[in-house]
Amino acid sequence: MIKIKKGLNLPIAGRPEQVIYDGPAITEVALLGEEYVGMRPSMKIKEGEAVKKGQVLFEDKKNPGVVFTAPASGKIAAIHRGEKRVLQSVVIAVEGNDEIEFERYVPEALAKLSSEKVRRNLIQSGLWTALRTRPFSKIPAVDAEPFAIFVNAMDTNPLAADPTVIIKEAAEDFKRGLLVLSRLTERKIHVCKAAGADVPSENAANIETHEFGGPHPAGLSGTHIHFIEPVGANKTVWTINYQDVIAIGRLFVTGRLNTERVVALGGLQVNKPRLLRTVLGAKVSQLTAGELVDADNRVISGSVLNGAIAQGAHDYLGRYHNQISVIEEGRSKELFGWVAPQPDKYSITRTTLGHFLKNKLFKFTTAVNGGDRAMVPIGTYERVMPLDILPTLLLRDLIVGDTDSAQALGCLELDEEDLALCSFVCPGKYEYGPLLRKVLETIEKEG
C-alpha cells in the first residue's frame, strides 16, 4: 500500500448517505463542449433534429476520428455557444428509447478480443472520450498508444460517493470492462483503490492493483501516476474513471451504450444528502429540484474544490463528474471578523478556534475571506501537497507564466484538480487551476 501523509480531508458538513436511490425523471441532457480540453467541434446535427442514443453529435476537428455521441434519444433542443463561438453545450430534450446498437460479444470472447476491435467499438460508441491523457488531460488520438492506463476506483474528494458501493452492484460489468481495457494495450492497467476496499479485478497478465491511503488527494489520478508511473514530455499515460469502466463492460456484452451515472448529492444545503442514480449529462436543476434548503445556494457539478457552477448553458452534469455539491453563497460581511475566535470557521492555519476542533464538521460557503493579495509562502502549500515537487516554486512559476521552470518543476504531471487544495489554502486567493491550464497550453503549443 502507498500511504501519503500530506494532504487535507476537508471537514465539510453534509456528507451523503452511501445508499443508492433512484433519481427523478430527467427530460434534458447535454454534452458540455468546454469540458474537453483543446476540442474544436465539427457539428453533425442541428437544432430541432431528432437523434438516437449513441448517435454522433459532433467530431473533434483537431483530433480526427474522435466522436461525441448522444447520451439519450430525443430532439436537439439547443446548441449554446459562447465568446468566439466556443461550444458550451448541446442540449437534448429526451424523448423515446431509440438507440444505435454497436458490436457485442459473449463474455467468454472478451479475453481474446483484438486491440483493433476494442478500439473501434470504443471510438464508434463515444466511450473513447472517457479516456484522458496525462500530461495535458486531453482525449487521446484514435491511433495513440499509452505507456499505461490508470483506472481510478477511489474518490477522496469532499462529499464524494464511495466507489465500492457503486462497483458492488455492477461487479461483473466492472471486471469485464477491465478485461476489455487489458486487450486495448499490452501495457500495464493500474487499478487504484482505497486501502482495504473491496474492488474486484481480473486475472489478466497486464492488470495490477494498487492500494492508496491517507488524506485527499490520495484518490486523485495525478497522485497515483506520480507514485506508480510518472509522466513527462515523452511519456504519456491514460486515465479512466471506474463508472466508465462499468459502461465499457456493458457495451461490449450488450452492444448498447450505457449512460447511467450514480452521483453523490451532498452539502449542508441539501435536505437529504445521498447517492442518486441518473444519466450522463443530466440537467442539474432537475436533479436538485425540491432537494435544497431555501437559500442563496451555489450548485456545483463536481467537487467543491474543483467543480463547475451548474447554471444556464452549463446546468448539466459534467462528463467527468460523479458528484453534485451544494454550498451557500457567502455574500455577508463580518465586522472585525478577524478579531473573533470563530469556532465555526475552519482554517488550515491556527488563525481560528475552528482549526483546533479536530472532529467538527463545518458549514462552508463560497466566501474566500479576503481579497486578492500577494502570494505568501508560509508553508501551507507544502502541508497539502504529497507529490515530490516544490509547490511554492512551481506555483510562483504558474503565476508569472514561466513555462520552462514550471516544466522542470513537474507541471506536466498535474491537472487542475491536483492543485485545488493549493488554491483552497492559498493566503493570496489565487486560483492555480486556470493558471496551470494556461501554462500547459503554452507548453503544448510552443514545446
Swiss-Prot record:
Keywords: Ion transport, NAD, Sodium, Sodium transport, Translocase, Transport, Ubiquinone. Its EC number is 7.2.1.1. NQR complex catalyzes the reduction of ubiquinone-1 to ubiquinol by two successive reactions, coupled with the transport of Na(+) ions from the cytoplasm to the periplasm. NqrA to NqrE are probably involved in the second step, the conversion of ubisemiquinone to ubiquinol. Composed of six subunits; NqrA, NqrB, NqrC, NqrD, NqrE and NqrF. GO terms for biological process: sodium ion transport. InterPro entries: NqrA, NQRA_2nd, NqrA_C_domain, NQRA_N. This is Na(+)-translocating NADH-quinone reductase subunit A. It comes from the Bacteria. Signal peptide: none annotated. Pfam families: NQRA_2nd (PF24836), NQRA_N (PF05896), NQRA_SLBB (PF11973). It is an enzyme of class 7 (translocase). It comes from Neisseria gonorrhoeae (strain ATCC 700825 / FA 1090). Transmembrane segments: none annotated. It catalyses: a ubiquinone + n Na(+)(in) + NADH + H(+) = a ubiquinol + n Na(+)(out) + NAD(+). Belongs to the NqrA family. GO terms for molecular function: oxidoreductase activity, acting on NAD(P)H, quinone or similar compound as acceptor.
